[in-house]
Amino acid sequence: MSPSNFTRIVLNSRPVENIEPDTFRKEVVPFNLKPGNGQVLVQVTWLSLDPAMRGWLRDARSYLPPVQIGEVMRAGGLGVILEAGPGSKYKPGQIVHGIFGWTEYVVVPDKALDLIVPPKGAEPLDFLNTLGSPGLTAYFGLKDVGQLKPGETLFVSGAAGAVGSLVCQLGKKAGAKVIAIAGSEEKVEWLEKDIGVDKALNYKSPTFHSDVKKQGYLDVYFDNVGGDMLNFMLTRLKKNARIVFCGAISEYNASQPKGLTSYMNLISQRAKLQGFIVFDYADQYQAAREDMAKWLGDGSVKRKFHIVEGLEQAPKALPMLFTGGNTGKLVVKVSDGPAKANL
């Protein structure tokens, strides 16, 4: 039986710097959703919170159009099909992945969905983490852009986050020396004891710069932070080093982001700094997921989720990504889904 109303969260105002309490607005609207031809009605169960979402709040040119004022906040997630419209290839009870947004229910066209069939050793939620965008970003960023080789030294910033922690693990699997950078002693301990990096460093430590220098120069730097961290790491390059420019989480809330000051080292060390977008590798997702699922199954790659309960908590949870409040993949549990879901 369908509810009489449902909740969704929309963009209320564009933040200049930090996400504020009035950035988003909750709406309770009548339930009048009905799938049309080639569409399905989905009950959202899980939503992914990712640093890229901060960029979607800016009214600026990017790889995706910005979320408009009054629109449901964009987010990827998992859901269960409640009803399939005429001509749909899906069936009620199937679990799907899509860009559902911050809402409890949504009508989505078939072409915008992926059916979730977890391989051995995996579970549906892994498609928001290791088998989803974070895992694929780590996989292709390190393999294609970083071109990491056995015996090389890899530094990873934002190492306790979803992407960073997976980069660390893939770096170890590739036979590299892995130095992880995080923002608390608890995260340092987790990275060394649970993730298995060679050394984890706390960037808030007064000895951080000297601690980095003790680890020698780097072959690959996987950058999730940008700003002062990137400028410092550009002074630590070996000849022919590669910088994988994945994100700049320290800059996303800045009204005037800092520019590069150490870029001349790219010339002197014949180094390369390259940005990338994981969507460009869509034709290779299946092969990457097969690898990652195998490693999940044999335990050589570990998963960690930071779970927030309830859709209404999403606006409060999103800023955690920019203050170091999460360890592992940050997700929102929206609902358990219907009892008939094929879990």
Regions found by a protein language model. Name each.
Residues 156, 172-232, 255, 279:
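Adenosine-nucleotide cofactor-binding segment
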Residues 3-6, 300-307, 315-343:
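C-terminal capping/lid region of NAD(P)-dependent oxidoreductase domains
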Residues 73-80, 89-158:
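NAD(P)H dinucleotide-binding glycine-rich loop of Rossmann-like/cofactor-binding domains
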Residues 32-49, 58-102:
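Glycine-rich beta-strand-centered segment in the early N-terminal region that forms part
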Residues 199-204, 306-313:
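Short acidic-hydrophobic, aromatic-tinged amphipathic segments that line or gate anion-handling sites
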